[in-house]
């Protein structure tokens, strides 16, 4: 059993969308209290100035980032920072005894050469990075439960890998045949002003970006290779959709056994995720919509087999800011502290 005492928690990078989602979740978590909100760009401002709707729940100010203060006040630290910054802070925090959950890409890779190639940043923390656990609980639950440093997955990899995992682990597909076509809402681009995220630009339009070179590609391939026990290459194309939040990933792959039918795969997926409360395998010809996951930590999976082409099609729907970011980070926190992984996380969406 885990500790039932309130744990002091800090968020560095609290002013962005990931930070405010974390703040909302942690304010309602029964076994933590927020002891520190850090962010240099908003330092000195009451958090309620940035997000007035949370003003009645807390009276914290955003402070300039000071790792000495963080270590003094907290036991657990969430890093919700741009790529490259967590690697400058995590070594000090971990060395001083804090548990760290990083929401950037800095600690997602087992091979830092891959990180350096795709993110263009040289790393000086290879020893620490080698101890990080990839924070996808459905696949790495045991490692997360004993970790001091967790690299929380990206939103696209979360949706894609939950769709692919049973297929790769059970050897049901040609692993290099996987094609991932994914759509995301505009909140995935962050809170900074960007032309393509303006209402006039994004509304009523959908289009691809990062074609053939999106940074989430090697992350998906790394975990897929681990699951398959061999090197896996995937084709991944993301699209920006005219919605605020949500990811819909449609995964196509060639089956090794063309005799398998949809009901077989639903049985296999249901068994694979039988101990995963945040993954819902849908029955029959039911396919998910992003609205179903809105504001929750759930991942919905719909499955189909095209006997004509010999392909399996898996549709995965999540909320990019919840299961794709802050919610999954809290799920990892629960595992690290020995608490039920559903604790403090919303399960039911608002509808319509």
UniProtKB/Swiss-Prot annotation:
GO terms for molecular function: N-acetyl-gamma-glutamyl-phosphate reductase activity; NAD binding; NADP+ binding. PROSITE patterns: ARGC. GO terms for cellular component: cytoplasm. The keyword Oxidoreductase applies. Pfam families: Semialdhyde_dh, Semialdhyde_dhC_1. Keywords: Amino-acid biosynthesis, Arginine biosynthesis, Cytoplasm, NADP, Oxidoreductase. It is found in: Cytoplasm. Pathway: Amino-acid biosynthesis; L-arginine biosynthesis; N(2)-acetyl-L-ornithine from L-glutamate: step 3/4. The active site is at residue 155. It catalyses: N-acetyl-L-glutamate 5-semialdehyde + phosphate + NADP(+) = N-acetyl-L-glutamyl 5-phosphate + NADPH + H(+). Its EC number is 1.2.1.38. GO terms for biological process: L-arginine biosynthetic process. SUPFAM superfamilies: Glyceraldehyde-3-phosphate dehydrogenase-like, C-terminal domain, NAD(P)-binding Rossmann-fold domains. The keyword Plastid does not apply. Belongs to the NAGSA dehydrogenase family. Type 1 subfamily. NCBIfam families: argC. Catalyzes the NADPH-dependent reduction of N-acetyl-5-glutamyl phosphate to yield N-acetyl-L-glutamate 5-semialdehyde. This is N-acetyl-gamma-glutamyl-phosphate reductase. It comes from Acaryochloris marina (strain MBIC 11017). The lineage of its organism: Bacteria, Bacillati, Cyanobacteriota, Cyanophyceae, Acaryochloridales.
């Amino acid at each position: 059993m885990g500790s039932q005492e309130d744990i002091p928690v800090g968020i560095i990078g609290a002013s962005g969308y990931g930070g405010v989602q974390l703040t909302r979740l942690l304010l309602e978590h029964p076994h933590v209290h927020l002891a520190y909100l850090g962010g240099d760009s908003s330092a000195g401002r009451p958090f309620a100035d940035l997000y007035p709707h949370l003003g009645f729940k807390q009276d914290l100010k955003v402070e300039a980032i000071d790792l000495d203060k963080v270590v003094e006040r907290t036991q657990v630290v969430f890093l919700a920072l741009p790529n490259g910054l967590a690697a400058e802070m995590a070594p000090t925090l971990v060395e001083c005894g804090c548990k760290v959950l990083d929401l950037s890409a800095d600690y997602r890779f087992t091979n830092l050469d891959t990180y350096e190639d795709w993110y263009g940043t040289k790393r000086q923390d290879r020893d620490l990075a080698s101890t990080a656990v990839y924070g996808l609980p459905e696949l790495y639950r045991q490692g997360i439960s004993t970790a001091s440093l967790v690299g929380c997955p990206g939103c696209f990899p979360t949706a894609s890998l939950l769709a692919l995992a049973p297929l790769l682990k059970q050897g049901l597909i040609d692993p290099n045949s996987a094609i991932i076509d994914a759509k995301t809402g505009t909140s995935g681009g962050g809170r900074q002003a960007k032309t393509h995220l303006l209402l006039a630009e994004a509304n009523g339009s959908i289009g691809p970006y990062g074609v053939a070179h999106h940074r989430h590609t090697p992350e998906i391939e790394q975990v897929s290779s681990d699951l398959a026990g061999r090197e896996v290459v995937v084709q991944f194309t993301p699209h920006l959709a005219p919605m605020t939040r949500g990811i819909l990933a449609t995964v196509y792959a060639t089956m090794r056994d063309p005799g398998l039918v949809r009901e077989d795969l639903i049985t296999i997926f249901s068994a694979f995720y039988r101990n995963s409360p945040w993954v819902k395998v849908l029955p029959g010809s039911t396919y998910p919509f992003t609205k179903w996951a809105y504001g929750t930590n759930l991942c919905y999976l719909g499955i189909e087999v095209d006997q004509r082409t010999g392909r399996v099609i898996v549709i995965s729907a999540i909320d990019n800011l919840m299961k794709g970011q802050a919610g999954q980070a809290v799920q990892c926190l629960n595992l690290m502290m020995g608490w039920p992984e559903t604790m403090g996380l919303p399960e039911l969406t608002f509808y319509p």
